[in-house]
Amino acid sequence: MNCMKGPLPLEHRAAGTKLSAASSPFCHHTQALAMASVLAPGQPRSLDASKHRLEVHTISDTSSPEVAEKDKGQQGKNEDVGAEDPSKKKRQRRQRTHFTSQQLQELEATFQRNRYPDMSTREEIAVWTNLTEARVRVWFKNRRAKWRKRERNQQAELCKNGFGPQFNGLMQPYDDMYPGYSYNNWAAKGLTSASLSTKSFPFFNSMNVNPLSSQSMFSPPNSISSMSMSSSMVPSAVTGVPGSSLNSLNNLNNLSSPSLNSAVPTPACPYAPPTPPYVYRDTCNSSLASLRLKAKQHSSFGYASVQNPASNLSACQYAVDRPV
């Protein structure tokens, strides 16, 4: 408000400049112009006016603390930016350590002995190789990572190349036997005589029996007919008629004929025959080759072995032929 008034006396101006400077900063320039216009005609107080001008300017500069703070803040930011730029550049740079061949040899030899060296070992290696402990630690860390990667690749190659053909070779027969996991192809494949002859059966080999001829072992009509014929020989041998027994022995080759089976009557069996303890042994004895061997024994030794066929009698026939 004082800026809009007219010129004041010099004494009042000196006292009012301080108040006006503290109250409104926009009045300083107008007051300076007014003082210059008043003192222009050559009055003797020009030096005092110049002093007051200097005081007004200094007060106006220091009277605005907000502007000063802004200026200081801008200067501080500029200084911070200038100080941060070189530090950022240093952080972005990665210092790579170039190892010599001697250092690498020493590090590799230590790595072969111990892949996880402790603090003291790393310090010793650092002394030997003229490196820092941190560099040695980082080198061992990177070397272990490379070693693990190589081990994984080697295991993958072994599983892919080494064991693959072996597993494929083992699985080929099962692919042939079970194509598409369909179990209805067993009848189409069948078991031929050639496939059975090429296979080995240790049980039949121990008994000297061909597996193809094992069908005759489980044929009950032949065994029953042989036992019936052997039972017909017993009475003739007991009564002392050698001719009939020899004739019956000569006719053993025709045991499987239906005429003989129908001609020889078998009495009714009230109870089932007992199962022999050695099924395979009795059936082998009832085969055609064993009967021929018995015929030869009868012809050579007479009546000494005539009673042997009685062991092949069933329980029913033995009970009927036994004298009461």
UniProtKB/Swiss-Prot annotation:
Q: Which Gene Ontology terms describe the biological processes this protein takes part in?
A: anatomical structure morphogenesis; animal organ morphogenesis; atrial cardiac muscle tissue morphogenesis; atrioventricular valve development; branching involved in blood vessel morphogenesis; camera-type eye development; cardiac muscle cell differentiation; cardiac muscle tissue development
Biased composition regions of type Basic residues, renumbered to the chain: 88-97
Q: Could you tell me in which tissues this protein is expressed? A: Expressed in the brain.
GO cellular component labels: cytoplasm; nucleus; transcription regulator complex
**What residue range is the signal peptide?**
none
**One Pfam family, short name please?**
Homeodomain
- The ranges the UniProt entry gives for DNA binding are 92-151
Q: Does the keyword Ribosomal protein apply?
A: no
| Region Disordered, annotated ranges | 57-111
Alphabetized, the UniProt keywords read: Cytoplasm, Developmental protein, DNA-binding, Homeobox, Nucleus, Phosphoprotein
Kindly give the PROSITE patterns that the UniProt entry links to this protein: HOMEOBOX_1, HOMEOBOX_2, OAR
Give the location in the cell. Answer: Nucleus; Cytoplasm
The record, for PANTHER family, names: PITUITARY HOMEOBOX 2 (PTHR45882:SF4), PITUITARY HOMEOBOX HOMOLOG PTX1 (PTHR45882)
Subunit structure, interactors included: Interacts with EFEMP2. Interacts (when unphosphorylated on Thr-97) with ELAVL1/HUR.
Q: What is this protein called?
A: Pituitary homeobox 2
Upper classification of the organism? Eukaryota, Metazoa, Chordata, Craniata, Vertebrata
- The protein's gene is named Pitx2
